[in-house]
């Protein structure tokens, strides 16, 4: 089972709107992952800058990167996330916004936790960054455990930290809320 779990595909969903200033850094953080079995689905949400050109440059370097185009700007990240989940091929679904970055070992450390049959969602603490992309030394602590009712009542998990197992959780759709995380 361990060999199987460590080779399972992770689909990373990245909504993008006018992200030319930072999408390259977000994609680079995915490319640096020590866990190699992933696909990155970047969902373009009608940007007016050259975000798509930047993503296409990365696509030319790595076939695991896919660009999906949303015809019109939805004004919220829920619609692009839902589009990404719909096209995802992986058993595991992870989320990374185009203005966030991951540590290189993020997937390598989180995926083995799914070997416990009771684990359906994995998440962690995260550190905030300032506008210039520098670490702000402000850690947002996640609760050690989140119940189903807590998940229904509000977002206790930092979006960029969460991964869920589709086989255990089933279909997940984001409501059309206006907040990002």
Give the residues covered by each predicted segment.
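N-proximal low-complexity "stem/linker" segments adjacent to membrane-targeting elements
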Residues: 1-31
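Acidic helix N-cap motif at the loop->helix transition within catalytic regions
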Residues: 21-24, 49-57, 101, 105
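A conserved acidic beta->alpha catalytic loop
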Residues: 44-53, 72-74, 97
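Glycine-rich, basic loop-to-helix element that forms the pyrophosphate-binding segment
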Residues: 70-88
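Conserved nucleotide-sugar donor-binding catalytic segment
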Residues: 86, 124, 142-181
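Short aromatic/hydrophobic "clamp" motif used to bind/position activated sugar donors
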Residues: 93
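The conserved acidic donor/metal-binding loop of glycosyltransferases
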Residues: 97-101, 125
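Conserved donor NDP-sugar-binding/catalytic core segment of glycosyltransferases
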Residues: 105-136
